[in-house]
Design a protein with these regions (language model features):
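Helix-enriched interaction subdomains in cytosolic or periplasmic regions
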Residues: 180-213
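Serine-esterase "nucleophile elbow" of acetyl-processing enzymes
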Residues: 203-279, 292-304
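Conserved small/polar residues in nucleotide/adenosyl-binding loops
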Residues: 430-437
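Hard-cation-handling environments
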Residues: 440
Length: 440
Protein backbone atom coordinates (compact mmCIF):
# COMPACT_ATOMS: atom_id res chain seq x y z
CA UNK A 1 0.00 0.00 0.00
CA UNK A 2 1.65 3.20 -1.15
CA UNK A 3 1.16 6.59 0.40
CA UNK A 4 0.07 9.47 -1.80
CA UNK A 5 2.48 12.40 -1.88
CA UNK A 6 6.21 12.79 -1.25
CA UNK A 7 7.72 12.17 2.14
CA UNK A 8 9.56 14.95 3.94
CA UNK A 9 13.36 15.05 3.67
CA UNK A 10 15.74 16.71 6.10
CA UNK A 11 19.46 17.32 6.31
CA UNK A 12 19.68 14.48 8.78
CA UNK A 13 18.84 11.93 6.10
CA UNK A 14 21.59 10.21 4.16
CA UNK A 15 22.67 12.38 1.26
CA UNK A 16 22.43 9.57 -1.25
CA UNK A 17 18.94 8.52 -0.14
CA UNK A 18 16.28 9.13 -2.75
CA UNK A 19 13.03 10.82 -1.77
CA UNK A 20 10.14 8.38 -2.15
CA UNK A 21 6.87 9.20 -3.83
CA UNK A 22 4.30 7.97 -6.30
CA UNK A 23 5.58 6.49 -9.53
CA UNK A 24 4.81 8.69 -12.54
CA UNK A 25 2.65 6.87 -15.11
CA UNK A 26 4.04 6.21 -18.58
CA UNK A 27 0.89 7.62 -20.14
CA UNK A 28 -1.60 10.14 -18.78
CA UNK A 29 -4.79 8.73 -17.27
CA UNK A 30 -7.72 8.85 -19.67
CA UNK A 31 -10.10 11.73 -19.03
CA UNK A 32 -13.19 9.93 -17.74
CA UNK A 33 -16.63 11.13 -16.80
CA UNK A 34 -17.16 11.02 -13.03
CA UNK A 35 -19.48 11.98 -10.22
CA UNK A 36 -19.06 12.43 -6.48
CA UNK A 37 -20.81 10.39 -3.82
CA UNK A 38 -19.00 12.38 -1.12
CA UNK A 39 -17.75 15.91 -1.59
CA UNK A 40 -16.02 17.78 1.23
CA UNK A 41 -17.91 15.46 3.57
CA UNK A 42 -17.19 16.02 7.25
CA UNK A 43 -16.23 12.84 9.07
CA UNK A 44 -15.21 11.98 12.61
CA UNK A 45 -13.30 8.88 13.67
CA UNK A 46 -15.18 7.62 16.73
CA UNK A 47 -13.08 5.56 19.14
CA UNK A 48 -13.67 1.81 18.78
CA UNK A 49 -13.44 -0.02 22.10
CA UNK A 50 -13.58 -3.56 20.74
CA UNK A 51 -13.33 -5.64 17.60
CA UNK A 52 -11.12 -5.33 14.54
CA UNK A 53 -10.51 -1.59 14.93
CA UNK A 54 -10.09 -1.47 18.70
CA UNK A 55 -8.17 1.63 19.76
CA UNK A 56 -8.59 3.35 16.40
CA UNK A 57 -11.16 5.82 15.11
CA UNK A 58 -13.75 4.85 12.50
CA UNK A 59 -16.39 6.74 10.52
CA UNK A 60 -19.02 4.31 9.20
CA UNK A 61 -21.07 5.46 6.19
CA UNK A 62 -23.83 3.07 5.15
CA UNK A 63 -24.59 2.75 1.44
CA UNK A 64 -27.16 -0.07 1.29
CA UNK A 65 -30.96 0.22 0.93
CA UNK A 66 -30.82 2.95 -1.71
CA UNK A 67 -28.35 5.18 0.11
CA UNK A 68 -25.64 4.95 -2.56
CA UNK A 69 -28.14 5.92 -5.25
CA UNK A 70 -29.28 8.85 -3.11
CA UNK A 71 -25.68 9.99 -2.63
CA UNK A 72 -25.15 9.94 -6.40
CA UNK A 73 -28.38 11.88 -6.91
CA UNK A 74 -27.86 14.50 -4.20
CA UNK A 75 -24.08 14.92 -4.11
CA UNK A 76 -23.26 13.91 -7.68
CA UNK A 77 -26.38 15.46 -9.23
CA UNK A 78 -26.85 12.28 -11.29
CA UNK A 79 -30.20 12.18 -13.10
CA UNK A 80 -29.60 9.21 -15.41
CA UNK A 81 -31.94 6.43 -14.19
CA UNK A 82 -29.82 3.69 -15.79
CA UNK A 83 -26.73 4.80 -13.87
CA UNK A 84 -28.64 5.12 -10.59
CA UNK A 85 -30.14 1.65 -11.01
CA UNK A 86 -26.72 0.08 -11.58
CA UNK A 87 -25.52 1.41 -8.22
CA UNK A 88 -28.06 -0.82 -6.47
CA UNK A 89 -26.15 -4.07 -7.06
CA UNK A 90 -22.52 -5.15 -7.14
CA UNK A 91 -22.91 -6.49 -10.69
CA UNK A 92 -24.31 -3.16 -11.84
CA UNK A 93 -21.60 -1.28 -9.95
CA UNK A 94 -18.88 -3.35 -11.62
CA UNK A 95 -20.35 -2.73 -15.07
CA UNK A 96 -20.51 1.04 -14.46
CA UNK A 97 -17.47 2.09 -12.44
CA UNK A 98 -13.93 2.05 -13.83
CA UNK A 99 -12.16 3.39 -10.73
CA UNK A 100 -12.72 5.11 -7.39
CA UNK A 101 -10.93 8.33 -6.40
CA UNK A 102 -10.51 9.00 -2.67
CA UNK A 103 -8.95 11.93 -0.82
CA UNK A 104 -8.80 12.84 2.86
CA UNK A 105 -7.78 16.14 4.40
CA UNK A 106 -7.14 16.52 8.12
CA UNK A 107 -4.89 18.30 10.59
CA UNK A 108 -2.45 15.39 10.94
CA UNK A 109 -1.82 15.28 7.21
CA UNK A 110 0.95 12.67 7.28
CA UNK A 111 -1.00 10.16 9.31
CA UNK A 112 -2.27 7.14 7.37
CA UNK A 113 -5.99 6.63 6.80
CA UNK A 114 -7.53 3.38 5.56
CA UNK A 115 -10.43 3.50 3.11
CA UNK A 116 -12.68 0.43 3.00
CA UNK A 117 -15.64 -0.12 0.68
CA UNK A 118 -17.46 -3.26 1.79
CA UNK A 119 -19.88 -5.18 -0.39
CA UNK A 120 -22.61 -7.14 1.38
CA UNK A 121 -23.00 -10.83 0.54
CA UNK A 122 -26.05 -12.83 -0.54
CA UNK A 123 -25.50 -15.75 1.83
CA UNK A 124 -23.13 -14.15 4.34
CA UNK A 125 -24.30 -10.54 4.63
CA UNK A 126 -21.29 -9.04 6.42
CA UNK A 127 -18.60 -11.63 5.72
CA UNK A 128 -19.25 -12.83 2.18
CA UNK A 129 -18.71 -9.66 0.18
CA UNK A 130 -15.63 -8.08 -1.36
CA UNK A 131 -13.59 -5.51 0.56
CA UNK A 132 -12.13 -2.75 -1.62
CA UNK A 133 -9.36 -1.30 0.51
CA UNK A 134 -6.49 1.16 0.22
CA UNK A 135 -4.32 3.30 2.45
CA UNK A 136 -3.71 7.01 1.92
CA UNK A 137 -2.66 10.07 3.89
CA UNK A 138 -4.69 12.97 5.16
CA UNK A 139 -2.96 15.51 2.93
CA UNK A 140 -5.75 15.93 0.39
CA UNK A 141 -3.96 14.03 -2.39
CA UNK A 142 -6.27 11.72 -4.33
CA UNK A 143 -5.60 7.99 -4.48
CA UNK A 144 -7.36 6.02 -7.20
CA UNK A 145 -8.41 2.37 -7.08
CA UNK A 146 -8.92 0.72 -10.47
CA UNK A 147 -11.63 -1.93 -10.17
CA UNK A 148 -9.87 -4.24 -12.65
CA UNK A 149 -7.34 -4.92 -9.89
CA UNK A 150 -10.00 -6.00 -7.37
CA UNK A 151 -10.50 -9.71 -6.64
CA UNK A 152 -14.28 -9.98 -6.47
CA UNK A 153 -16.07 -12.62 -4.38
CA UNK A 154 -18.83 -14.86 -5.71
CA UNK A 155 -21.17 -14.01 -2.82
CA UNK A 156 -21.28 -10.28 -3.68
CA UNK A 157 -24.78 -8.81 -3.62
CA UNK A 158 -25.07 -5.05 -2.97
CA UNK A 159 -22.73 -2.16 -2.06
CA UNK A 160 -22.85 -2.12 1.73
CA UNK A 161 -20.81 0.45 3.60
CA UNK A 162 -17.77 2.71 3.44
CA UNK A 163 -15.36 3.06 6.35
CA UNK A 164 -12.63 5.59 7.00
CA UNK A 165 -10.24 4.19 9.62
CA UNK A 166 -7.97 6.63 11.48
CA UNK A 167 -4.93 5.52 13.47
CA UNK A 168 -5.63 8.28 16.00
CA UNK A 169 -9.27 8.28 17.15
CA UNK A 170 -11.54 11.27 17.80
CA UNK A 171 -10.29 13.45 14.96
CA UNK A 172 -12.18 15.20 12.18
CA UNK A 173 -11.48 15.05 8.46
CA UNK A 174 -12.99 16.15 5.16
CA UNK A 175 -13.27 13.41 2.57
CA UNK A 176 -14.04 13.16 -1.14
CA UNK A 177 -15.07 10.01 -2.98
CA UNK A 178 -15.85 9.98 -6.69
CA UNK A 179 -16.64 7.26 -9.21
CA UNK A 180 -14.92 7.38 -12.61
CA UNK A 181 -17.12 5.73 -15.22
CA UNK A 182 -16.35 3.11 -17.84
CA UNK A 183 -16.45 3.90 -21.54
CA UNK A 184 -20.00 4.35 -22.75
CA UNK A 185 -21.29 6.13 -19.65
CA UNK A 186 -21.41 9.87 -19.23
CA UNK A 187 -22.61 12.40 -16.65
CA UNK A 188 -22.37 16.21 -16.86
CA UNK A 189 -19.31 17.77 -15.24
CA UNK A 190 -20.07 18.77 -11.64
CA UNK A 191 -20.75 22.42 -10.92
CA UNK A 192 -18.42 24.27 -8.58
CA UNK A 193 -20.24 25.18 -5.37
CA UNK A 194 -20.12 28.67 -3.96
CA UNK A 195 -19.27 29.26 -0.32
CA UNK A 196 -22.47 29.91 1.62
CA UNK A 197 -22.64 33.59 2.58
CA UNK A 198 -24.56 33.71 5.85
CA UNK A 199 -24.56 37.50 5.81
CA UNK A 200 -26.25 37.73 2.43
CA UNK A 201 -29.78 38.91 1.72
CA UNK A 202 -30.53 35.55 0.13
CA UNK A 203 -29.54 33.66 3.28
CA UNK A 204 -31.74 35.89 5.41
CA UNK A 205 -34.68 35.41 3.05
CA UNK A 206 -34.20 31.65 3.25
CA UNK A 207 -34.27 31.73 7.05
CA UNK A 208 -37.37 33.94 7.04
CA UNK A 209 -39.25 31.43 4.86
CA UNK A 210 -38.95 28.88 7.66
CA UNK A 211 -41.45 30.76 9.84
CA UNK A 212 -44.54 28.70 9.04
CA UNK A 213 -46.59 30.12 11.92
CA UNK A 214 -45.94 32.24 14.98
CA UNK A 215 -49.18 31.06 16.56
CA UNK A 216 -49.72 32.29 20.08
CA UNK A 217 -46.17 33.11 21.13
CA UNK A 218 -47.05 34.12 24.70
CA UNK A 219 -45.35 31.08 26.21
CA UNK A 220 -42.23 31.69 24.10
CA UNK A 221 -42.01 35.26 25.39
CA UNK A 222 -42.38 34.08 28.99
CA UNK A 223 -39.42 31.74 28.51
CA UNK A 224 -37.30 34.61 27.16
CA UNK A 225 -38.33 36.89 30.05
CA UNK A 226 -37.41 34.18 32.53
CA UNK A 227 -34.00 33.69 30.91
CA UNK A 228 -33.31 37.42 30.84
CA UNK A 229 -34.15 37.64 34.54
CA UNK A 230 -31.45 35.07 35.31
CA UNK A 231 -33.90 32.37 36.39
CA UNK A 232 -33.19 28.74 35.48
CA UNK A 233 -34.52 27.81 32.04
CA UNK A 234 -34.55 24.36 30.42
CA UNK A 235 -34.78 23.86 26.66
CA UNK A 236 -35.72 20.29 25.72
CA UNK A 237 -35.96 18.48 22.40
CA UNK A 238 -37.74 15.27 21.50
CA UNK A 239 -37.44 13.71 18.05
CA UNK A 240 -35.60 11.25 15.86
CA UNK A 241 -32.09 10.92 14.48
CA UNK A 242 -31.86 14.54 13.31
CA UNK A 243 -32.53 15.72 16.86
CA UNK A 244 -30.03 13.12 18.06
CA UNK A 245 -27.53 14.91 15.83
CA UNK A 246 -27.08 12.51 12.92
CA UNK A 247 -24.98 14.06 10.16
CA UNK A 248 -23.32 16.53 12.53
CA UNK A 249 -19.58 16.09 13.12
CA UNK A 250 -18.92 15.94 16.04
CA UNK A 251 -22.49 14.91 16.75
CA UNK A 252 -23.15 16.54 20.12
CA UNK A 253 -21.61 19.97 19.53
CA UNK A 254 -22.51 20.62 15.88
CA UNK A 255 -26.14 19.45 15.91
CA UNK A 256 -29.00 21.92 15.61
CA UNK A 257 -30.17 21.26 19.18
CA UNK A 258 -26.84 22.26 20.70
CA UNK A 259 -26.40 25.21 18.33
CA UNK A 260 -29.86 26.62 19.05
CA UNK A 261 -29.43 26.16 22.79
CA UNK A 262 -26.06 27.91 22.66
CA UNK A 263 -27.43 30.80 20.57
CA UNK A 264 -30.46 31.23 22.84
CA UNK A 265 -28.35 31.10 26.00
CA UNK A 266 -25.83 33.55 24.57
CA UNK A 267 -28.47 36.07 23.58
CA UNK A 268 -31.08 35.79 26.33
CA UNK A 269 -29.47 33.89 29.22
CA UNK A 270 -27.44 35.00 32.22
CA UNK A 271 -24.66 33.25 34.09
CA UNK A 272 -25.20 29.83 32.49
CA UNK A 273 -28.84 29.70 33.56
CA UNK A 274 -30.06 27.92 30.40
CA UNK A 275 -30.00 24.11 30.44
CA UNK A 276 -30.20 21.65 27.53
CA UNK A 277 -32.02 18.29 27.38
CA UNK A 278 -31.64 16.48 24.05
CA UNK A 279 -33.89 13.43 23.67
CA UNK A 280 -33.41 12.47 20.04
CA UNK A 281 -33.30 8.77 19.19
CA UNK A 282 -32.84 7.55 15.63
CA UNK A 283 -35.72 5.70 14.01
CA UNK A 284 -38.28 6.49 16.72
CA UNK A 285 -41.72 7.89 15.78
CA UNK A 286 -44.04 10.05 17.87
CA UNK A 287 -45.92 6.85 18.69
CA UNK A 288 -43.11 6.20 21.18
CA UNK A 289 -42.97 9.88 22.08
CA UNK A 290 -45.36 9.61 25.03
CA UNK A 291 -43.16 7.03 26.78
CA UNK A 292 -39.90 8.64 25.77
CA UNK A 293 -41.05 12.10 26.89
CA UNK A 294 -41.61 10.83 30.43
CA UNK A 295 -38.35 8.91 30.51
CA UNK A 296 -35.94 11.01 28.42
CA UNK A 297 -37.20 14.57 28.89
CA UNK A 298 -39.03 14.70 32.23
CA UNK A 299 -36.75 11.97 33.58
CA UNK A 300 -39.51 10.63 35.79
CA UNK A 301 -40.45 14.03 37.17
CA UNK A 302 -36.95 15.31 37.89
CA UNK A 303 -36.97 17.85 35.04
CA UNK A 304 -39.39 20.66 34.20
CA UNK A 305 -38.73 21.99 30.69
CA UNK A 306 -39.66 25.56 29.83
CA UNK A 307 -39.47 25.12 26.04
CA UNK A 308 -39.94 21.84 24.17
CA UNK A 309 -39.02 21.46 20.49
CA UNK A 310 -40.92 18.56 18.87
CA UNK A 311 -39.35 17.10 15.70
CA UNK A 312 -41.05 14.06 14.13
CA UNK A 313 -41.91 15.32 10.62
CA UNK A 314 -39.66 12.76 8.92
CA UNK A 315 -40.15 9.89 11.37
CA UNK A 316 -43.91 9.29 11.32
CA UNK A 317 -44.45 7.86 7.83
CA UNK A 318 -45.36 4.47 9.34
CA UNK A 319 -47.68 5.96 11.96
CA UNK A 320 -50.94 4.02 11.67
CA UNK A 321 -52.74 6.68 13.72
CA UNK A 322 -52.08 9.28 10.96
CA UNK A 323 -51.03 11.99 13.39
CA UNK A 324 -53.14 11.19 16.45
CA UNK A 325 -50.13 10.01 18.47
CA UNK A 326 -48.27 13.16 17.46
CA UNK A 327 -51.20 15.29 18.61
CA UNK A 328 -51.43 13.38 21.89
CA UNK A 329 -47.76 14.07 22.58
CA UNK A 330 -48.22 17.77 21.82
CA UNK A 331 -51.28 18.12 24.06
CA UNK A 332 -49.55 16.20 26.85
CA UNK A 333 -46.72 18.75 26.85
CA UNK A 334 -49.08 21.71 26.57
CA UNK A 335 -51.18 20.55 29.53
CA UNK A 336 -48.26 20.21 31.95
CA UNK A 337 -48.69 22.26 35.18
CA UNK A 338 -45.75 24.55 34.36
CA UNK A 339 -47.22 25.36 30.91
CA UNK A 340 -44.05 24.97 28.82
CA UNK A 341 -43.82 26.53 25.37
CA UNK A 342 -44.09 24.02 22.53
CA UNK A 343 -42.39 24.63 19.18
CA UNK A 344 -43.07 22.30 16.23
CA UNK A 345 -40.09 21.75 13.94
CA UNK A 346 -40.54 20.19 10.50
CA UNK A 347 -37.26 18.79 9.12
CA UNK A 348 -36.93 17.51 5.54
CA UNK A 349 -35.30 14.69 3.58
CA UNK A 350 -33.13 15.20 0.50
CA UNK A 351 -36.05 14.31 -1.79
CA UNK A 352 -37.93 17.35 -0.40
CA UNK A 353 -40.31 15.11 1.58
CA UNK A 354 -41.76 15.44 5.06
CA UNK A 355 -45.12 15.06 6.81
CA UNK A 356 -45.80 18.76 7.18
CA UNK A 357 -49.25 18.58 5.59
CA UNK A 358 -50.32 15.96 8.13
CA UNK A 359 -48.76 17.54 11.21
CA UNK A 360 -49.03 21.30 10.68
CA UNK A 361 -52.82 21.29 11.26
CA UNK A 362 -52.05 20.13 14.81
CA UNK A 363 -50.00 23.27 15.33
CA UNK A 364 -52.71 25.37 13.76
CA UNK A 365 -55.38 23.83 16.01
CA UNK A 366 -53.46 24.74 19.17
CA UNK A 367 -51.97 27.99 17.82
CA UNK A 368 -48.40 26.77 18.19
CA UNK A 369 -45.21 28.29 16.75
CA UNK A 370 -44.03 26.22 13.77
CA UNK A 371 -40.76 26.18 11.82
CA UNK A 372 -40.48 24.47 8.43
CA UNK A 373 -37.01 23.62 7.17
CA UNK A 374 -38.60 22.36 3.97
CA UNK A 375 -40.17 25.74 3.26
CA UNK A 376 -36.84 27.43 3.94
CA UNK A 377 -34.45 25.42 1.79
CA UNK A 378 -36.27 23.46 -0.92
CA UNK A 379 -37.42 26.40 -3.11
CA UNK A 380 -33.86 27.66 -3.55
CA UNK A 381 -32.38 24.20 -4.30
CA UNK A 382 -33.85 24.44 -7.81
CA UNK A 383 -32.28 27.81 -8.51
CA UNK A 384 -28.87 28.22 -10.12
CA UNK A 385 -27.84 31.86 -10.06
CA UNK A 386 -29.54 32.78 -6.77
CA UNK A 387 -29.14 29.49 -4.91
CA UNK A 388 -27.89 30.04 -1.37
CA UNK A 389 -27.01 26.46 -0.42
CA UNK A 390 -26.91 23.29 -2.52
CA UNK A 391 -28.35 19.94 -1.51
CA UNK A 392 -24.83 18.58 -1.23
CA UNK A 393 -23.95 21.37 1.19
CA UNK A 394 -27.12 20.95 3.25
CA UNK A 395 -27.47 17.15 3.39
CA UNK A 396 -24.94 14.72 4.86
CA UNK A 397 -26.85 11.84 3.27
CA UNK A 398 -30.38 11.29 1.98
CA UNK A 399 -31.86 11.85 5.43
CA UNK A 400 -29.67 13.99 7.66
CA UNK A 401 -28.18 17.50 7.54
CA UNK A 402 -24.49 18.37 7.43
CA UNK A 403 -22.95 20.70 10.01
CA UNK A 404 -24.08 23.54 7.77
CA UNK A 405 -27.57 22.05 7.55
CA UNK A 406 -27.77 21.82 11.33
CA UNK A 407 -26.58 25.44 11.55
CA UNK A 408 -29.37 26.53 9.20
CA UNK A 409 -31.93 24.66 11.31
CA UNK A 410 -30.70 26.40 14.46
CA UNK A 411 -30.82 29.78 12.71
CA UNK A 412 -34.43 29.11 11.70
CA UNK A 413 -35.38 28.38 15.32
CA UNK A 414 -33.61 31.51 16.55
CA UNK A 415 -35.39 33.58 13.92
CA UNK A 416 -38.74 32.52 15.35
CA UNK A 417 -37.64 33.35 18.90
CA UNK A 418 -36.35 36.77 17.87
CA UNK A 419 -39.55 37.56 15.98
CA UNK A 420 -41.66 36.51 18.96
CA UNK A 421 -39.70 38.88 21.20
CA UNK A 422 -39.56 41.83 18.81
CA UNK A 423 -43.01 41.57 17.27
CA UNK A 424 -45.39 40.23 19.92
CA UNK A 425 -48.55 40.81 17.86
CA UNK A 426 -47.46 38.88 14.76
CA UNK A 427 -49.39 35.74 13.83
CA UNK A 428 -48.44 34.10 10.54
CA UNK A 429 -51.07 31.48 9.82
CA UNK A 430 -50.52 28.10 8.20
CA UNK A 431 -52.02 28.35 4.73
CA UNK A 432 -51.51 26.16 1.67
CA UNK A 433 -49.43 22.98 1.35
CA UNK A 434 -46.13 22.99 -0.52
CA UNK A 435 -45.84 21.05 -3.80
CA UNK A 436 -44.44 17.94 -2.07
CA UNK A 437 -47.07 16.46 0.25
CA UNK A 438 -47.10 13.48 2.57
CA UNK A 439 -48.34 11.13 -0.14
CA UNK A 440 -45.45 11.76 -2.53
Amino acid sequence: KAFAGVRSWTAGDKEDEQMSGPVAPKDPEKDRSYFYIMKEKETFGSLQTQGEYQGRGVQFIYESDGRLESSAEVTGEVCDEEILKKLGTVEGFKSLVHSIGISVEMEHSREPVTFVFQMYGKEDLYGGGTLIETELRGDGAEVRITLDTVKWKTDDDVPGQIRFVFETPEQSARVNVRFFLKDGFFVPKPQEERVVDMESHGYQEMIERSLLSMGDAGRIRRVVEKARAGEPVTIAYIGGSITQGAGAVPLHTQCYAYRFWKAFAGKYGKNNNVKLIKAGVGGTPSELGMIRFERDVLRDGKEKPDLVVVEFAVNDEGDETKGRCYESLVTKILSMPDAPAVLLLFAVFANDWNLQERLAPVGERYQLPMVSIRDAVTPQFRQTKDRVVSKNQFFYDAFHPTNLGHKIMADCLMYLIDRAVCEPDICLLYTSPSPRDSTS
